[in-house]
Each structure stands twice: as structure tokens, then as C-alpha cells.
């Protein structure tokens, strides 16, 4: 009886550990993917950069993208 209880507890611990590890290994967002709703999900070599959208001087929204760390993007006309 003790062996059955011990085995059950060990199996429960193993399943819990596997589920916790799978939770930590969520798929990350690749470069140029939208991260507005998930700013912490960009892959490790990327950062979630956000930009405001304006029309006639009034802010109309915000866009966020997974971009390379340390890279500066400039608008070209």
C-alpha cells in the first residue's frame, strides 16, 4: 500500500515538472512579428519596440514589433 502511494506521488511530481517546463518553453515571436499584446514574447536576441501612430497630430494608435537589439531604424523619404 505504501509503495502504491509513493509511486503515485512520484508520478504526480514528474507530471507537474514536465508541465512547468513546457510552460517556460513558450514559442517566441520571430523578427518583425507584432508584439503589441505580448511585449515579453520576442525571441532572446530581439526586443519589442513600440511606435505611436499619428494622424494630423493626433495619436491614433500604437504598433509594436520584435526588432534586433541595438539597431536604430530611421524613416526614409
Curated annotation (Swiss-Prot):
In which tissues or organs does this protein occur? Expressed by the venom gland.
Matches recorded under InterPro entries: Spider_toxin_CSTX_knottin
Q: Where is the signal peptide?
A: 1-20
The GO terms describing molecular function are: toxin activity
Which residues does UniProt call coiled coil?
A: none
Q: How is it modified after translation?
A: Contains 4 disulfide bonds.
User: Which cellular component, as a GO term, is one annotated location?
Assistant: extracellular region
A Pfam family found in this protein is: Toxin_35
**Top-rank lineage group of the source organism:** Eukaryota
Which stretches of the sequence are propeptide?
Answer: 21-26
Where in or outside the cell?
Answer: Secreted
Q: Which UniProt keywords are given for this protein, alphabetically ordered?
A: Disulfide bond, Secreted, Signal, Toxin
The text of the family note is: Belongs to the neurotoxin 19 (CSTX) family. 08 (U8-Lctx) subfamily.
**Designated name of the protein:** U8-lycotoxin-Ls1u
Amino acid at each position: 500500500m505504501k509503495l502504491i502511494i509513493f509511486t503515485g506521488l512520484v508520478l504526480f511530481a514528474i507530471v507537474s515538472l514536465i508541465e512547468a517546463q513546457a510552460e517556460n518553453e513558450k514559442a517566441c515571436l520571430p523578427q518583425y512579428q507584432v508584439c503589441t499584446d505580448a511585449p515579453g514574447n520576442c525571441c532572446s536576441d530581439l526586443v519589442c519596440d513600440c511606435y505611436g501612430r499619428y494622424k494630423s497630430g493626433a495619436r491614433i494608435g500604437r504598433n509594436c514589433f520584435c526588432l534586433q537589439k541595438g539597431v536604430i531604424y530611421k524613416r526614409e523619404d
